[in-house]
Regions:
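Phosphate-binding beta-alpha-beta segment of Rossmann-like dinucleotide-binding domains, i.e.
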Residues: 88, 96-146, 158-161
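Residue-level detector of anion-binding/catalytic polar loops
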Residues: 28, 91, 113, 169, ...
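An N-terminal-biased, well-structured beta-alpha scaffold segment characteristic
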Residues: 1-93
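Short gly/ser/thr-rich secondary-structure transition/capping motifs
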Residues: 28-35, 51-52, 126-134, 183-189
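Structured loop/turn residues at beta-strand edges in well-structured enzyme cores
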Residues: 44, 62-65, 116, 191, ...
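Rossmann-like dinucleotide/phosphate-binding beta-alpha-beta segment
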Residues: 135-197
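Short low-complexity, flexible loop/linker segments enriched in glycine and/or proline
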Residues: 44-47, 108-111, 185-188
Length: 197
C-alpha cells in the first residue's frame, strides 16, 4: 500500500475543501491556525502545504525536504518565499479566479457607501432624526462619474462591468494590456498614471 501524502493546511479553508481532503484516503492532513513549533517539526516530511495569508519564510520552506506543492489559497504570493520554493523544486499554485468578483463587488459597495453617505444617513434614521437629512452632506450619483481602474487583470475586468452598469466613464491604466482589450470591454485607456490621477 502506498504511503499517504501528508498535507499541512495553514489557516483554515472552506469546509468543502476540508471535506474533499477527508474524502480522499490517499491523504492525511492537519490544520494549523498559525505557524508554530509543532508545524515547523511536521513540515520536514510533508508533501503539500495549503496556506492563506500567513508568511511562509525561507527557513520553513527550506526545511521541507519532501515538499512538492504550496497551494496559496488566494491570488497573491507575496507571503511565500519564492527563492526557497524554487530551490527545493516545489510548485506554487494560486487560486487565480477565486476572488475577482468578490473584490469588484466590494469596490462597488464602497463606492455606493461613500457616494450615498450611507453611514451618516443610516445613523440619522436609526436615531429617528428624519429631518436631519437637510443638515447632512448631499449624496451624489455614480452615473456619469469618472473612475480610473489601475490594473486591468481579473479584478479590474470584473470591476469595469459593474461600473458600466452604473453608466460610469471608465478609464483604465495598465501598461501590459493593449488598447483593444480595454476598448472591447468599454473602457478608455490612459497611458500616464500621474496624468490620469
Amino acid at each position: 500500500m502506498p504511503e499517504k501524502k501528508k498535507i499541512l493546511v495553514i489557516q483554515n479553508i472552506h469546509q468543502e475543501g476540508i471535506n474533499l481532503l477527508k474524502g480522499n484516503s490517499s491523504y492525511e492532513f492537519e490544520i494549523f491556525d498559525e505557524i508554530n513549533e509543532d508545524l515547523k517539526q511536521k513540515i520536514v516530511d510533508c508533501d503539500a502545504i495549503s496556506i492563506r495569508t500567513a508568511k511562509l519564510p525561507n527557513e520553513i520552506i527550506s526545511s521541507a525536504k519532501k515538499l512538492q506543492v504550496i497551494s496559496r489559497h488566494g491570488v497573491g504570493y507575496d507571503n511565500i518565499d519564492l527563492k526557497s520554493t524554487k530551490e527545493i523544486g516545489a510548485t506554487l499554485t494560486i487560486t487565480a479566479t477565486a476572488n475577482a468578483v468578490a473584490v469588484a463587488e466590494h469596490v462597488m459597495f464602497m463606492l455606493l457607501n461613500i457616494s450615498k453617505r450611507k453611514d451618516m444617513y443610516d445613523q440619522s434614521v436609526k436615531l429617528g432624526k428624519f429631518n436631519d437629512r437637510n443638515k447632512l452632506p448631499k449624496t451624489i450619483e455614480l452615473w456619469g462619474k469618472n473612475i480610473l481602474i489601475a490594473g486591468f487583470g481579473r479584478i479590474g475586468q470584473a470591476l469595469i462591468k459593474r461600473c458600466l452598469g452604473f453608466e460610469m466613464n471608465v478609464f483604465v491604466y495598465d501598461p501590459y494590456i493593449n488598447d483593444e482589450k480595454i476598448k472591447s470591454l468599454g473602457g478608455k485607456k490612459v497611458n500616464d498614471l500621474k496624468e490620469a490621477v
